A protein has these predicted regions:
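Conserved catalytic motifs of ABC-family nucleotide-binding domains
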Residues: 161
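Conserved ABC transporter NBD signature motif
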Residues: 62-73, 81
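Conserved ABC ATPase "signature" region
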Residues: 117-135
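A short, flexible loop at the N-terminus of ABC-type nucleotide-binding domains that lies
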Residues: 1-2, 11-25, 74-77
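Helix-to-loop junction immediately C-terminal to a conserved catalytic motif
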Residues: 54
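Conserved ABC ATPase signature
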Residues: 140-144, 148
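The feature captures the beta-strand-to-loop junction immediately N-terminal to the Walker
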Residues: 39-41
Length: 166
């Protein structure tokens, strides 16, 4: 299993006075079981690159292959890709939106077509993984501490059981 970027370029506001080349000729392969760190200065393209990994942003040029399939190919199932490549944002607490923690963590699995019971089972397991017990299930995610919000948001991605976690 791998996620491969081949000569990926990305330009913000192409053809305008505000054109910015955020990514230039990026070649990268992420293989199963690898842990990869991405470092760089503010504005160096780290977040832009990460957004390409599950198709949130489309490369201006180049290809991205998941399990050997071009994600920009006609008819590619981007919904499936996004459930297989889980993305935790730089400020994951901004991902929270439901009325309680358990509902928030269930959102992804429910969008994958799971029943309420199946989604809750995955959500409970993910919340346990990040150290949030039953006492948090019915709390508003907005009443949690900053660290608890981050853990709840990460649990929301883990509950979808992605093959790759970014």
């Amino acid at each position: 299993m791998s996620l491969k970027l081949e000569h990926v370029n990305y330009i913000y506001s192409p053809g305008t006075a505000y054109e910015i080349h955020a990514l230039k000729d990026i070649c990268l392969e992420l293989k199963s079981g690898e842990f990869v760190g991405l470092i760089g200065h503010t504005g160096s393209g780290k977040s832009t690159l990460v957004q390409h990994l599950n198709g949130l942003v489309k490369a201006t040029e180049g290809r991205i292959l998941f399990h050997g399939e071009d994600i920009y190919g006609g008819g590619y199932d981007m919904r499936r890709l996004r459930s297989k490549v889980g993305l935790v944002f730089q400020y994951p607490e901004h991902q929270l939106f439901e009325v309680d923690v358990l509902s928030d963590v269930c959102f992804g699995p429910r969008n994958q077509g799971l029943t309420k019971e199946e989604a809750e089972e995955k959500a409970r397991a993910a919340l346990a993984m990040v150290g949030l017990g039953e006492e948090f299930y019915h709390q508003s995610p907005f009443e949690l501490s900053g660290g608890q919000k981050r853990r709840a948001a990460i649990a929301g991605v883990l509950a979808m059981e992605p093959e790759i976690l970014v």
